[in-house]
Amino acid sequence: MLYNPGVLLAQLFGGQLKSSSSTYPTGTVHCKPQSRTAVVEVTNPITGEIWMDRNLGAEQVAISNTDALAFGDLYQWGRRADGHQCRISGTTSTLSNIDQPLHDDFILVPTSNNRDDWRSPQNNALWQGVAGINNPCPSGFRIPTSAEFTTERQSWSSNNSTGAFNSVLKLPLAGYRERTDGVVSLIAEGSPYGMLWTSTINNEEAIFFAYWSGNAFVNPYPRSRGYSVRCIKN
């Protein structure tokens, strides 16, 4: 299902979908300006939650869980959509001491870094709610919490990547970007993975939501890794 720029279409996909008039934050860098992510709402009929029907940066709703056009971008936790999230963005090893780095590079963090965060010192408020300092979601949307992803998972037909794709969210196996070298990989532990950030922090790390052929779960991980983002309506 393809969308022309500026045209929002809705299609029934197991749940209720409708177009939205939401706009992206000022300064948002779209990795593919000619096909910026359409804002279309999808409602989970079991939980009642309203989500975007695709990942940030995705060109279309996934038609399979390996649909590359549905993968979207890979964000470091807490960063705005400044271009670092583009899968082919440059890299830098210089940590940032401000909330909005003055560049579009993916910030590499060695494993020897005590906090393993792109920002030093850390700021826990960057992605908290619609008013989060660096919330990359369109107006009225935000990064979901760990609890919200857990509730979503519990509504699936199976607790794995099959359940993720068969759900109304049509979640693809979009991979991740490694924090130490900036390499993008679709494979983790020998299997394709889908990994999405939540807004929930856990001490010096943040909670991400992962799913693969064998399981789906939430877990803490260093904030400097690049994961997908799926926005939820506030």
Where are these regions (language model features)?
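Core domains of carbohydrate- and sulfate-ester-processing enzymes
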Residues: V61, D82-N97
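Extracellular/luminal ectodomains of metazoan preproproteins built from arrays
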Residues: T26-T28
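C-terminal, surface-exposed recognition/capping segments
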Residues: G15-S20, H30, R36-A38, N44-H84, ...
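Extended terminal accessory/targeting regions
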Residues: N97, P101, D105-I107
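N-terminal low-complexity, intrinsically disordered "leader/linker" segments enriched in small/polar
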Residues: L2-Q16
